[in-house]
From Swiss-Prot:
The lineage of its organism: Bacteria, Pseudomonadati, Pseudomonadota, Betaproteobacteria, Neisseriales. This is ATP phosphoribosyltransferase regulatory subunit. It comes from Neisseria meningitidis serogroup B (strain ATCC BAA-335 / MC58). Required for the first step of histidine biosynthesis. May allow the feedback regulation of ATP phosphoribosyltransferase activity by histidine. Belongs to the class-II aminoacyl-tRNA synthetase family. HisZ subfamily. One of its GO terms (biological process) is histidyl-tRNA aminoacylation. Heteromultimer composed of HisG and HisZ subunits.
Length: 383
């Protein structure tokens, strides 16, 4: 194997793309900041038991584990920043009993890629709100997610909505155990209506519940799905509440194209209620995902309402605006010492100044000029 080879689904980011990513990252954090979201920077590595919450079993398949040479304990390299932010809210920011608005942008590492076209080292960016259970919190985060997609130059975005509360309400009413719920969740994700019908029949569920579960995979489409669901699903207060939340989101974004899928349930995840995602042209999967995950912080000692979204900024490279390198001022190597004060003054003003050693350079072809001493004063002479 060549020494320059990298592992599968791992890649370097070269200067042109690095400028794009850093510019987008700065703009996103600025956007989050003016909406009241404070930046946190959790560590890349933690004790495994802190990263691998019992709530999301699927996270263990993504997490790379190592042994700490200092303590002998098992460490994990984070595969998702959200559990870390939940820990911060629950423990380090526990003095605040009100709302915590937090954001982040940092690398995560996956033991295996999410798909054939995905990288194993995403640059995960996102925003989260803790301590507010009202649907208005979700609407605020969805609005922020859509604004983030504008910065990423995504063009027209489709907003996809779901709600795991509907499935859970039906499961509770039908007295399904955890194993049965997990089985149905997997079948729902596959949109295998025939398999769902066969499974509920095999369990000999009451006709009303069997019909409701068989109906869920068919309840997808535009905003009209909500009125259809109200007329066909069992009259349960939790179901009505979930449909009401979905309606509130639809009303909040009248000009946005919305797709509703009541069988979009995200197997093996920590979400508890409303689910939302953004889709854009030329992407094989959602460009951003979010939802409500009330109680996640309970694993760390403080269960609170929570909602938020995240996305892999690195996956947007093909769509991010090009950021040209700043034209540089060259200074001949033999003049560098004498021109030191002038060089530093230019750099303090934000001007790129490069010492020319006479063997070529990697600066932009468009040079701002060359620093020369004219009439006793160091000046930038245009070419």
């Amino acid at each position: 194997m060549q020494t320059w080879q990298l592992p599968e689904h791992i890649a370097d980011v070269l200067p042109t793309n690095a400028r794009q990513l850093e510019s987008a990252r700065e703009q996103l954090l600025a956007l989050f900041r003016v909406h009241g979201y404070e930046l946190v920077q959790p560590p890349l590595m933690e004790y495994a038991h802190s990263l691998l919450t019992h709530i999301d079993a699927g996270l263990s398949l993504k997490t790379i584990l190592v042994t700490d040479r200092l303590s002998g304990r098992q460490l994990g390299i984070r595969a998702d920043i959200t559990p870390q932010v939940a820990r911060i809210d629950a423990h380090l920011l526990s003095a605040n009993q009100g709302i915590n608005r937090l954001c982040y942008a940092g690398p995560v590492l996956h033991a295996q890629p999410d798909g054939l076209l995905n990288m194993r080292e995403p640059l995960q960016a996102g925003a989260e709100m803790y301590g507010f259970a009202d649907i208005r919190g979700d609407i605020e985060l969805i609005d922020l997610m859509l604004k983030s997609m504008k910065i990423a130059d995504m063009g027209k975005v489709l907003l996809s909505l779901g709600h795991i509360g509907i499935f859970r309400a039906l499961s509770d009413a039908a007295h399904l155990d955890a194993g049965q719920s997990a089985t149905l969740l997997a079948l729902m994700q596959d949109k295998d209506t025939g398999a769902v019908e066969a499974q509920v029949k095999a369990w000999k569920l009451d006709g009303m519940w069997a019909k409701a579960f068989s109906l869920l995979p068919r309840l997808y489409g535009g905003r009209e799905v909500l009125s259809d669901a109200r007329g066909r699903l069992p009259d349960l207060s939790a179901v009505g509440g979930a449909l009401g939340e979905l309606q509130a989101v639809c009303d909040a974004f009248p000009d946005c194209e919305i797709h509703i899928d009541l069988s979009e349930l995200r197997v093996d995840n920590y979400h508890t209620g409303l689910l939302y995602a953004a889709y854009a042209a030329d992407f094989h999967d959602a460009v951003a995902r979010g939802g409500r995950y009330d109680g996640l912080g309970g694993y760390f000692g403080r269960a609170r309402p929570a909602t938020g979204f995240s996305f892999d900024l690195r996956s947007f490279i093909g769509r991010l605006p090009a950021i040209e390198r700043q034209p540089a001022v060259l200074v001949d190597a033999e003049d560098a010492e004498a021109a030191h004060e002038a060089v530093e003054a230019l750099r303090e003003q934000g001007q790129c100044v490069v010492i020319d050693y006479g063997i070529g350079h990697n600066v932009s072809e468009e040079l701002a000029g060359r620093l020369k001493k004219t009439d006793g004063v160091w000046q930038v002479v245009k070419r």
